[in-house]
Amino acid sequence: GNNPTLYSYVLDTNFWIDLFGLKIIPTVTRGSNNEILTASATISRTDLGTGSATNASSRTYARKLGNIDDDAGHIIGNQLGGSGGKKNVFPQDFHVNRGEFAKFEGNVAEFVNLHGKADIKITFEYANGGTRPTRIHYEATAPNGDKISNSFNNHH
């Protein structure tokens, strides 16, 4: 997984439990309001299908950053090996999260499976300021340079 240390199994056991540190936690840059600006990770074929669902704590966290009916959207999707903990979620409109975003993550999983791995880069826009993104840009790049990308509004 993306655990940056060699000697610990999880980064913070208060957020999630991952006994072997195998879930994907993206590298994230944040703005002055603690809003997510960018996220990146490398997903390998072996990561596919190893992610975890969100939990009550991560859903509460995401809704405090966004709307009361928002999903805790995975930055790196569950099907791509992403953790459901607080360090890998953002406030996402549930229609988008369960619809076009989930479908695109399935396309990314197929892309990773085809190419063996992919570098993921995600950029979040905040047209209204605050901590709930209004638009998400998602790009996956294979080792040979092939790319797939999409952009999503965070409303329906």
What are these regions, as identified by a protein language model?
Residues 1-23:
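Short turn/helix-capping motifs enriched in Asx and small/polar residues
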